[in-house]
Amino acid sequence: MEEWRMIKMKITVLVENSTSCRLYGEHGLSVYIEYDGKKYLLDTGASTLFAKNAKELGISLADIDTAFLSHAHYDHSGGFEAFFKENDKAEVYMQDTSAENCYFRTETGDKYIGIPVQLLEAYKERFHTLHTVCEVEKGV
């Protein structure tokens, strides 16, 4: 019979569309997660504001063990360069479609809204694409 154990999870929103008086908000999302003794980052928002909020909240980006990218749009991936400057160890997992070119069609032409190609190239050893739903660590 499988044994169950209770594990605490703490979720902190670092940046999203609304804000409190002491934190920055922006169009985008970044979430910090503590689970089973590990620290995770889900997305980095559109800019460096997630990092400023993390610092304000006493969260060290250098301590994050693993990062995830939900999808390639700039409002979820725009802060990865700032993240890599503070964290030299975390692997980043993303679905295989996240590395695709993403464009927004406007009246004046197409605008690229995906992950900067130069960032994917510069940190290619840390980006890992997943082709199916899987566990990257037990329970995650």
Where does each model-flagged region fall?
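Active-site metal-binding loops of divalent metal-dependent hydrolases
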Residues: 16-18, 44-47, 72, 97-98, ...
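Short, structured patches in soluble enzyme cores that scaffold and shape functional sites
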Residues: 15, 94-96, 131
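Short, glycine/charged-enriched secondary-structure capping and boundary segments
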Residues: 26-28, 56-57, 82-84, 107-109
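Metallo-beta-lactamase
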Residues: 99-140
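Active-site metal-binding motif and surrounding structural segment of the metallo-beta-lactamase
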Residues: 49-97
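Short, Lys/Arg-enriched N-terminal segments with co-localized hydrophobic residues
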Residues: 1-8
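Conserved beta-strand hairpin/beta-sheet module of binuclear metal-dependent hydrolase folds
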Residues: 9-56
